[in-house]
């Protein structure tokens, strides 16, 4: 049975937290974020403020995360937000709204139970419950509100069983009380594990099926509502779903980030005593978390936040690869990591040192390209970037091609603007450089802002904090537009400010309490939600 759900009316919100400085912005940035206010849940470190959505109709913000489950915020006074209604539910992972309906999802009461979607009105009165797939992680409405799409991650359980991932399509055309659900699975013959693995889709377990191991994470809907694009983060892939036919069109591997390329690079060590971004002979699985979709110049584009995700039991430091192979022979192929093969970057001995690549976490399943038992390539987790993908092909046979990638901009800009936050840990301060050997800044949430005839991409950096921006009005040549952080990386507790940005959304000027477009940033670890005015300087 699902957890008991009740409605509670709350009249007072918690006090605002101390106000740390807003850092990172430069006067020369073409865009900036001006802080307007912050809601503090008073519940840090319990995922109480993960995802938020704005209802223009109710002029309220709906927030989900830890207890109580779903919160409605009255932000009429931006300096003093208050909770005016809650809905109690355990394990709520996502919330969405369209017109007069609020939708939320949560897992079953027991690990092997199916998940559930809750349909509520704007006052959080329950309208209907619908069973969906295992482990629903994210949901969103199609632009016209006729369908609700749910990504059911189906993560492995501690007992070793692996629940299948799926995508649920909920038909709302006859109203929420008459909603019907169709589950789209990944068990079609053309998506067998051998065929997908040959194309580059990552599967950590050789004996489990593709349907069990594919894990839907996040969804973007095309503007006409015909197709959904679903990230499969652990698999380093993205799936295209036909929403009318309720079927998987294709699954696309996303490839890697080449950190050895000119002008690229990363800081791979947390023990080198400094922030050092430079090219290294290593590739990064993109493994995006969130994804968005927009139309420009007659074409469709996807945008992905290439966060990365380590695989349980399949992550090892470079210096430990030889131990894992249980061999005295070097783990790295000398011919692949010689000075000549590495374009003079680093000798293999230096690569293995703790102030080189030695401490970087890599995927041992990848890199032995010739099958001789040593590694010809090193492949780590995460692209430390954001990327644009051009959608091509036809309606039933789509294609995607990477059109642009931000490369090492995230690490370089954070280092230049807020050096004490460089690759810091969101759960510890001060902690500069602590996440360098893992996945760096970990771009996670994103949103697209249409303002003043321009298109602004906002990306939250989960570990170091803050929001980085690009003007993508010309998707062929995005322009870095600015960075803003409300974190004090030298402080701890409430005075540290906003920690671990997760969900981002936009309040349009037409329904904004201040009459200007506002960016909402949910911060998972600090338990805070902050509002920023979005301003174009030129």
Predicted regions and their residues:
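Generic N-terminal initiation segments characterized by hydrophobic and/or small/turn-forming residues
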Residues: 1-2, 6-8, 30, 342
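Beta-sheet-rich non-transmembrane sensory/scaffold domains
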Residues: 17-538
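Bacterial Sec-dependent signal peptides at the C-terminal "C-region" and cleavage site
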Residues: 3-20
């Amino acid at each position: 049975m699902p957890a008991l759900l009740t409605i509670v009316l709350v009249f007072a919100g918690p006090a605002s937290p101390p106000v740390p400085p807003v850092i990172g912005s430069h006067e020369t940035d073409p865009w900036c974020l001006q802080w307007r206010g912050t809601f503090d849940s008073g519940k840090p470190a319990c995922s109480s403020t993960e995802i938020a959505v704005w209802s223009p109709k109710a002029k309220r913000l709906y927030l989900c995360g830890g207890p109580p489950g779903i919160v409605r915020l009255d932000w009429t006074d931006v300096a003093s937000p208050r909770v005016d209604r809650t809905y109690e539910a355990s394990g709520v992972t996502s919330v969405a709204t369209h017109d007069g309906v609020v939708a939320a999802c949560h897992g079953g009461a027991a690990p092997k139970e199916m998940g559930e979607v809750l349909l509520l009105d704007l006052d959080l009165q329950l309208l209907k419950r619908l069973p969906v797939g295992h482990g629903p992680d994210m949901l969103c409405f199609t632009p016209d509100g006729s369908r609700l799409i749910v990504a059911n991650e189906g993560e492995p359980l501690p007992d070793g069983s692996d629940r299948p991932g799926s995508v649920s399509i909920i038909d709302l055309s006859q109203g929420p009380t008459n909603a019907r659900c169709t589950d789209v699975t990944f068990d079609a013959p053309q998506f067998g594990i051998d065929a997908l693995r040959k194309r580059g889709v990552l599967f950590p377990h050789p004996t489990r099926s593709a349907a069990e191991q594919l894990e839907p994470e996040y969804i973007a809907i095309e503007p006409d509502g015909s197709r959904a694009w679903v990230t499969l983060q652990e698999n380093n892939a993205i799936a295209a779903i036909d929403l009318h036919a309720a079927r998987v069109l294709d699954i696309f591997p996303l490839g890697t980030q080449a950190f050895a390329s000119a002008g690229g690079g990363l800081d791979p060590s947390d023990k080198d005593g400094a922030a050092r971004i430079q090219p290294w002979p290593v590739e990064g699985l993109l493994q995006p978390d969130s994804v968005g979709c927009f139309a420009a110049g007659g074409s469709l584009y996807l945008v992905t936040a290439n966060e990365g995700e380590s695989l349980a039991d399949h992550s090892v430091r470079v210096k430990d690869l030889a131990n894992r192979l249980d061999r005295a022979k070097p783990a790295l192929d000398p011919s692949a990591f010689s000075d000549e093969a590495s374009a003079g970057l680093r000798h293999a001995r230096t690569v293995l040192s703790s102030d080189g690549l030695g401490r970087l976490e890599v995927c041992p399943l990848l890199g032995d390209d010739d099958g001789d038992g040593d590694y010809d390539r090193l492949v780590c987790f995460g692209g430390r970037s954001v990327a644009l993908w051009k959608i091509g092909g036809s309606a039933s046979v789509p294609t995607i091609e990477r059109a642009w990638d931000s490369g090492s901009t995230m690490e370089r800009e954070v280092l230049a603007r807020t050096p004490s936050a460089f690759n810091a840990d969101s759960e510890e301060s001060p902690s500069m450089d602590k996440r360098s050997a893992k996945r760096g800044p970990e771009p996670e949430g994103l949103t697209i802002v249409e303002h003043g005839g321009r298109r602004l991409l906002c990306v939250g950096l989960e570990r170091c904090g803050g929001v980085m921006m690009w003007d993508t009005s010309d998707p062929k040549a995005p322009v870095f537009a600015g960075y803003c952080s409300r974190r004090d990386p030298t402080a701890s507790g409430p005075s540290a400010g906003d920690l671990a940005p997760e969900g981002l959304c936009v309040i349009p000027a037409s329904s904004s309490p201040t009459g200007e477009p506002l960016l909402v940033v949910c911060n998972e670890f600090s338990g805070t939600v902050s509002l920023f005015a979005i301003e174009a300087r030129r």
